[in-house]
């Protein structure tokens, strides 16, 4: 229960990272988004950056190569963000850069997923 909420929180924070990813190998699912971003939840709620967080962010960035994948990831992240309380969106906005991933927009739960390309 708490793990599910934590996973959803991380997904919301990394919404924009996945949305703008340039490379992919397979279709994105909400389960994939949740599992890859689960290690980031503690950090987004004020704790230390977990060891697997950046690896998950990079993997999702690489997997979201197509517009449909990026839109799916975006919607998964927004759903997760709405389900988890206590996310520090300032930390979320800085997380991609900390992990060496560049995204051309701000991370926000209000991102219009239909406008993602």
From Swiss-Prot:
Disulphide bonds in the chain: 30-76, 40-53, 54-99, 74-113
Source organism, top-level taxon: Eukaryota
Gene3D superfamilies, per the entry: Plant lipid-transfer and hydrophobic proteins
Name of the protein: Non-specific lipid-transfer protein
Keywords of this entry: Disulfide bond, Lipid-binding, Signal, Transport
SUPFAM superfamilies per record: Bifunctional inhibitor/lipid-transfer protein/seed storage 2S albumin
Signal sequence coordinates: 1-26
InterPro entries given in the database record: Bifun_inhib/LTP/seed_sf, Bifunc_inhib/LTP/seed_store, Plant_nsLTP
Species of origin: Spinacia oleracea (Spinach)
């Amino acid at each position: 229960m708490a793990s599910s909420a934590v996973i959803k929180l991380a997904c919301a924070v990394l919404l924009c990272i996945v949305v703008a990813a340039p490379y992919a190998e397979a279709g994105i699912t909400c389960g994939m988004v949740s599992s890859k971003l689960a290690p980031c939840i503690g950090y987004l709620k004020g704790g230390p950056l977990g060891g697997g967080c950046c690896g998950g962010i990079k993997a999702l960035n690489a997997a979201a190569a197509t517009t449909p994948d990026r839109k799916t990831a975006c919607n998964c992240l927004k759903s997760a963000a709405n389900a988890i309380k206590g996310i520090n969106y300032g930390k979320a906005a800085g997380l991609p850069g900390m992990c060496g991933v560049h995204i051309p927009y701000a991370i926000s739960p209000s991102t219009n997923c239909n406008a993602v390309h």
